[in-house]
């Protein structure tokens, strides 16, 4: 399996991207990595592995650049070069921790959408009390209509099926209350479409329901989704810091911490976003993964693992098939 990695994207590029890529090569013997970046950034990697191919790109798309303009102007950027490799079929997936807007714009311009999909969605996996849930959209589409939300549900259904191994994943529509009549007109219309679909729709869910794990898929527009994502990341960090402070307060708390160290590690590991890799751009015609902007080697390794599973489970083909099956429920 051939995967392309943007070595120049993210807050800790290229060092941490390279470390994560080399770790993945060491761990997964069935992958080849095409590492894309400036020649000086990739210096010294020649001969590291026969499954590592270096692709030199002289430009980098920065986080503060306008997405569409950057994609069109910087044809030799690591991001554009990676997307072009994917388009040509030279690799099977592309991963970047770079500019999210540029990655989405480039994916749309270079790769295009799955037929029938109006808007792709960013779909991160969030940790919950009972496992994990897919959230979509997490920031790509701040304004959505009911058709967009319905399609997000279809894509989330397939993604959860293949990645979690659940035949009928539960789908919840994010709202300000669980009652059917709650929400704005878009959410109310989306509720009706989901209720009358073949999907395992459980109704409206509230913010507090997500960490409880009441469903495997949470559907919302990108504005709300991004707020949910960032809030959960912030809460996880605060809880982790509070635990560290309290358990190191004195000799007695330190002794207690030693006794529960195993449990604490499991809790912090479950709450750690780096364990869940990146977020696929579902709805794009080929596999593209967006890693977190502040990803270090561990997060990159897990994002590569996720890309491998996305390709191995043939998720995009199944999304295409599901969209065709639900064609009578979607006006394209």
Swiss-Prot record:
Top-rank taxon, per record: Bacteria
Catalytic activity, EC: 2.3.1.274
Primary location recorded for the protein, binned into one broad class: cytoplasm
GO terms, biological process: fatty acid biosynthetic process; phospholipid biosynthetic process
InterPro entries per record: FA_synthesis (IPR003664), Phospholipid_synth_PlsX-like (IPR012281)
Places the protein is found: Cytoplasm
One GO CC term, this protein: cytoplasm
Coiled coil segments of this chain: none
Molecular function GO terms recorded: phosphate:acyl-[acyl carrier protein] acyltransferase activity
Keyword entries, A-Z: Cytoplasm, Lipid biosynthesis, Lipid metabolism, Phospholipid biosynthesis, Phospholipid metabolism, Transferase
Record's function text: Catalyzes the reversible formation of acyl-phosphate (acyl-PO(4)) from acyl-[acyl-carrier-protein] (acyl-ACP). This enzyme utilizes acyl-ACP as fatty acyl donor, but not acyl-CoA.
Subunit description: Homodimer. Probably interacts with PlsY.
Protein name: Phosphate acyltransferase
Gene this protein is translated from: plsX
């Amino acid at each position: 399996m051939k995967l392309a990695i943007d070595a120049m994207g993210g807050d800790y590029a290229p060092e941490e991207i390279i470390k994560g890529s080399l770790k993945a090569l060491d761990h997964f013997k069935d992958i080849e990595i095409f590492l894309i970046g400036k020649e000086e950034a990739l210096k010294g990697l020649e001969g590291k592995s026969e499954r590592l191919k270096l692709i030199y790109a002289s430009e980098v798309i920065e986080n503060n650049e306008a997405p569409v303009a950057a994609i069109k102007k910087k044809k030799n950027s690591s991001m554009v070069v990676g997307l072009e490799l994917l388009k040509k079929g030279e690799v099977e997936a592309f991963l970047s921790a770079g500019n999210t807007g540029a990655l989405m714009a480039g994916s749309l311009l270079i790769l295009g959408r799955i037929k029938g999909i109006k808007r792709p969605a960013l779909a991160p996996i969030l940790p919950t009390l009972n496992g994990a849930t897919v959230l979509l959209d997490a920031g790509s589409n701040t304004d959505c209509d009911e058709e967009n939300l319905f399609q997000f549900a279809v894509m989330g259904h397939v993604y959860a099926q293949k990645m979690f191994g659940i035949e009928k994943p539960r789908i919840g529509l994010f709202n300000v209350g669980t009652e059917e009549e709650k929400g704005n007109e878009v959410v109310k219309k989306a509720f009706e479409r989901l209720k009358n679909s073949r999907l395992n729709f459980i109704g409206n869910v509230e913010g507090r329901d997500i960490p409880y794990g009441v469903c495997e898929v949470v559907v919302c527009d990108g504005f709300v989704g991004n707020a949910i994502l960032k809030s959960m990341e912030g809460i996880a960090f605060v809880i982790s810091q509070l635990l560290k402070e309290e358990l190191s307060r004195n000799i007695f708390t330190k002794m207690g911490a030693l006794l529960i160290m195993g449990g604490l590690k499991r809790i912090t590991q479950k709450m750690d976003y780096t364990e869940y890799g990146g977020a696929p751009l579902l709805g794009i015609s080929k596999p593209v993964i967006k890693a977190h902007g502040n990803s270090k080697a561990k997060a990159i390794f897990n994002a590569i693992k996720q890309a491998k599973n996305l390709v191995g489970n043939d998720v995009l083909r199944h999304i295409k098939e599901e969209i065709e099956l639900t064609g009578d429920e979607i006006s394209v």
